[in-house]
């Protein structure tokens, strides 16, 4: 499970073969990688798999970064999955939503009451990751 999250993390950055891109091009992968990691933690907490949560929080993730023309593999902690998706900010402004977190709104919409995991479980996981 954690290896899949690690692979998703590599999609958040531009491949060196891509020479033309815009700043929002990889935002969808940033949101997907964050949501996947959050769901992993939420499900582990619900199943009381604290060993998995601990492993996820202690693991060093290898993420290949290609920003600025570089090609640098970097090991980092789980915070790599919480990347700012600028396109969500622009959506908030463009639609005059006045929301604090469009990402949270999308999660709430995708995980209504009765879903697995529940939105409440995702909020709990987010709090654990914040602490």
Where are these predicted regions, by residue range?
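Long, low-complexity, intrinsically disordered terminal regions
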Residues: 1-131
């Amino acid at each position: 499970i954690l290896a899949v999250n690690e692979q998703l993390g590599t999609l958040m950055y531009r491949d060196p073969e891509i020479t033309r891109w815009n700043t929002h091009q990889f935002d969808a992968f940033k949101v997907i990688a964050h949501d996947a990691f959050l769901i992993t933690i939420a499900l582990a907490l619900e199943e009381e798999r604290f060993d998995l949560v601990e492993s996820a929080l202690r693991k060093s993730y290898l993420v290949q970064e290609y920003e600025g023309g570089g090609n640098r593999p970097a090991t980092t902690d789980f915070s790599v999955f919480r990347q700012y998706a600028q396109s969500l900010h622009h959506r908030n402004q463009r639609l005059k939503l006045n929301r604090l977190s469009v990402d949270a709104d999308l999660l709430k919409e995708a995980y209504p009451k009765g879903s697995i995991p529940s939105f409440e479980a995702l909020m709990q996981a987010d709090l654990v990751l914040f602490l």
